[in-house]
Every structure is written in structure tokens, then in C-alpha cells.
Swiss-Prot record:
Oligomer status and interactors: Homodimer.
Function in brief: Catalyzes the formation of acetyl phosphate from acetate and ATP. Can also catalyze the reverse reaction.
The name this protein goes by in its record: Acetate kinase
Encoding gene (name): ackA
Binding-site list for Mg(2+): 6, 380
Catalytic activity: acetate + ATP = acetyl phosphate + ADP
NCBIfam families: ackA (TIGR00016)
Subcellular location field: Cytoplasm
Family: Belongs to the acetokinase family.
Listed InterPro entries: Ac/propionate_kinase, Aliphatic_acid_kin_short-chain, Aliphatic_acid_kinase_CS, ATPase_NBD
Species in which this protein is naturally found: Mycoplasma capricolum subsp. capricolum (strain California kid / ATCC 27343 / NCTC 10154)
Alphabetized UniProt keyword annotations: ATP-binding, Cytoplasm, Kinase, Magnesium, Metal-binding, Nucleotide-binding, Transferase
GO biological process terms held by the UniProt record: acetate metabolic process; acetyl-CoA biosynthetic process
Alphabetical list of PROSITE patterns matching this protein: ACETATE_KINASE_1, ACETATE_KINASE_2
Lineage, highest ranks first: Bacteria, Bacillati, Mycoplasmatota, Mollicutes, Mycoplasmataceae
Length: 393
């Protein structure tokens, strides 16, 4: 069995995979409000469990998870868990999932300055598992690793080169675990080896990015040094004129940190619509002809369409355009509006297919479309499980 952990500052999402046959999760859970007034909940064999517990820290939460797995006889002993895979948001210039040793842990620590909200939580969880399961292999899967194949012309910024040399200022990109899963899935769907696949993948969730996949590898992506760059998102602004920060700071007697917080937490869909960061709420207002919701949706759609056209220019041919993540998988209206804005590529959506229910993936383009368009459900936890399994063999 493989345990997959995604650790946040006050929560731990986890899945337990049985890898003896098909690689499918047998348990899906969440430890939440760690350090406040916590609880643990999970689902196993269609039965839901919830346990109230103070959860003073991550180590206590992981200990409780393991205790409940044993108490409920989901596992008979800890050694049944052959590996633990961790999602780590930032790996700097690490280019692949890695067995966690002191060197890798140090590199994760060095990347804290690039992901101060995310990496510390991963480090805490890794150290807790190491203490509680000292004989179990641990693997770090990085959201940034997939994008390490980008050429320098795409990852360097036009700023003093010494900023890159001294401070690591460059585009890193994110959602790499999701993109890797989608590339593997497209290899299966399109029956074409991934080293020959050219894709434009739109990962549209509350955080959103697009990646240009050339010969199965990341060639460019919309997020940058941090996840703030690129597309308009739920609460993030995406790309803006950076001098806005200084201008608004002066106008409001704020500092750059305060303005950056606003760009991260109060912008995007929330900022423009003044309604919500959730696309479902914004679309409700859009249907009611709310002017701010309309401009928010139109801006969101336009920015995605612009990136699709930009990335199409990098590719000699395109095997598919893919929509994934919460909005990409579920918001048929947004998929349709985006494809209608991409005038140069001849994308044609079949409305019936686009609106139909599906489990894993579906083709949503019509026969007239010059390029196939798919909605594919991403599965980052399964990708982490597969990487963990491959590395511990």
C-alpha cells in the first residue's frame, strides 16, 4: 500500500492506495484545523468516519491517522504501507520526484523562500512521518519538477541576469503533478507515445495555469516564480503591470507586501466580480446579467484564450487541447466561451458532448473541429502514488 499526503499549514489531505491490483484509493481523508480544534474524517468502503481531536500539531494528526487505520483493521500493521508520497509545491530546480534523504530535504528547505506558505507544511509532515514510520520509504513529488524541461528563453525573465544567479529569479511553473498525469492520460486516450505528444493543457481550478506540452514535455507555462503569475484566477490577479504595486502602495500608504497580499487574496474573479472567488457563484450572477460578473467572466475567458493562441504558435501541430481541474472539468459554459474566443485554431465544440456527464474523460469537440478538445479529470494523488511506487521498487 502507498499513503499519499498533501500537507497544508493547518490540514493534511491523505489517500491510501492499494497497489496489489489496480492502483485505486481505498481510503480518502482529511485532518483539519490542526493546532486549533481539530478533527479527522475519512471514507472507506462507502462508510464515513469522523473523529473529534484537538490535533495540536501535524505529528499528532499523522499518528491519529495511523492509529485509526490499525483500529479499524484497514491495515494490520504499519509495515503494510510500503511508501509515503508527499506533494511538495516547490522543488526549485529539482527535475523529478525524489526519494527523500537529507540532501533532498535540504533542497526543500532552501525553496521555502520561494513557497513560504506551502513548503514549511510539507517539511513538518515529512519529519513527522520519518519519526513515526522510520523504516518506510518517503518520496517527494514536486509541482515544479515537470516544468524543468522548459528552455531558458521561456523560463528567464528580462531582468538583470544576476537576479537568476544570486536569487533564483526565474519562471518555475506549478501544477506539474497534474500536467504529468494529463500527459500520461493523453498517451492512453490518443494512442500515441507521449514523447510525440503536442498538447495545450488548461488546468483551471481556483488556482489556474496553462502549459504548452511539446513532445510530451513542458515547453512553457503561465505561472512564474510564484503561482501569482499568468491567468486570472479565483483570488489571484495573474499577469499585471508590476508598477501597479508601487503606484497603489503610494496611493494607500501601504507597503509592497500588503499590495502583494491583495493581488493574491482579493483579486481575480473575486476582485472583478465583487461577488465570489468561486466560478459557480460568479456564473450565477453572470446568468442574471450582473455587469461585474459579466466582465469578470469575459476577462477570465479572454486571458485563457490568449494563452492558448500564444502556445499554439510554439507547436508545429497540436494533438489536443485539454481542460482539467475544477473549472476545466466541470464548467461547460467556460469551456465553450474559451473555445469560441480562440478563433485562429478552428476549435468547434459539440454542445451535447460538452454538457454531458462523464466519469474519467470525454471528447467535447465536434467532427468539424480542426483540433480535438477534451475534458479530462486530473488525479494528482494517483500520479504521486505511481511515482512513489516506481521509486521504491
Amino acid at each position: 500500500m502507498i499513503l499519499v499526503i498533501n500537507s497544508g499549514s493547518s490540514s493534511i489531505k491523505f489517500k491510501l492506495f492499494d497497489t496489489s491490483k489496480a492502483i485505486e484509493p481505498i481510503l480518502d481523508g482529511l485532518a483539519e484545523r490542526i493546532g486549533i480544534d481539530g478533527f479527522l474524517k475519512f471514507e472507506h468502503n462507502n462508510q464515513k468516519y469522523k473523529f473529534e481531536d484537538p490535533l495540536p500539531d501535524h505529528e499528532h494528526a499523522i499518528q491519529l491517522i495511523l492509529n485509526k487505520l490499525l483500529e479499524l483493521k484497514i491495515i494490520s500493521n504499519i509495515d503494510e504501507i510500503k511508501g509515503v508520497g508527499f506533494r511538495v509545491v516547490h522543488g526549485g530546480e529539482i527535475s523529478h520526484s525524489s526519494i527523500i534523504n537529507e540532501e533532498v530535504l535540504q533542497k526543500i528547505q532552501e525553496s521555502v523562500k520561494l513557497a513560504p506558505l506551502h513548503n514549511p507544511a510539507a517539511i513538518i509532515a515529512i519529519k513527522a512521518v520519518k519519526k513515526l514510520m522510520p523504516n518506510t520509504s518517503m518520496i517527494a513529488c514536486f509541482d515544479t519538477a515537470f516544468h524543468q524541461t522548459m528552455p531558458q528563453v521561456n523560463y528567464l525573465y528580462s531582468v538583470p541576469y544576476k537576479w537568476y544567479e544570486e536569487f533564483g529569479v526565474r519562471k518555475y511553473g506549478f501544477h506539474g503533478i497534474s500536467y504529468e498525469y494529463i500527459v500520461n492520460k493523453c498517451e492512453e486516450i490518443l494512442n500515441k507515445k507521449k514523447e510525440h505528444l503536442n498538447l495545450i493543457v488548461c488546468h483551471l481550478g481556483n488556482g489556474a495555469s496553462i502549459s504548452c506540452i511539446k513532445d510530451g514535455k513542458s515547453y512553457d507555462t503561465s505561472m512564474g516564480l510564484t503561482p501569482l503569475a499568468g491567468l486570472m484566477m479565483g483570488t489571484r490577479s495573474g499577469d499585471i503591470d508590476v508598477s501597479i504595486c508601487e503606484y497603489v502602495a503610494k496611493q494607500t500608504n501601504s507597503d509592497i507586501f500588503a499590495i502583494t497580499q491583495i493581488l493574491n487574496k482579493q483579486s481575480g474573479l473575486l476582485g472583478l466580480s465583487q461577488t465570489s472567488a468561486d466560478m459557480r457563484d460568479v456564473l450565477e450572477q453572470y446568468d442574471r446579467n450582473d455587469k461585474k460578473a459579466i466582465i469578470a467572466v469575459e476577462k477570465y475567458v479572454q486571458v485563457v484564450a490568449d494563452f492558448i493562441v500564444k502556445y499554439a504558435n510554439y507547436l508545429d501541430s497540436i494533438d489536443a487541447v485539454v481542460f482539467t481541474a475544477g473549472i476545466g472539468e466541470n464548467a461547460d459554459v467556460i469551456r465553450d466561451l474559451i473555445c469560441k474566443r480562440v478563433k485562429l485554431l478552428g476549435l468547434q465544440i459539440d454542445q451535447e458532448k460538452n454538457e454531458s456527464k462523464y466519469s474519467d474523460y470525454k471528447l467535447i469537440s465536434s467532427e468539424k473541429s480542426k483540433i480535438p478538445v477534451y475534458a479530462i479529470r486530473t488525479n494528482e494523488e494517483k500520479m504521486i502514488c505511481l511515482d512513489t511506487l516506481n521509486l521504491i521498487k
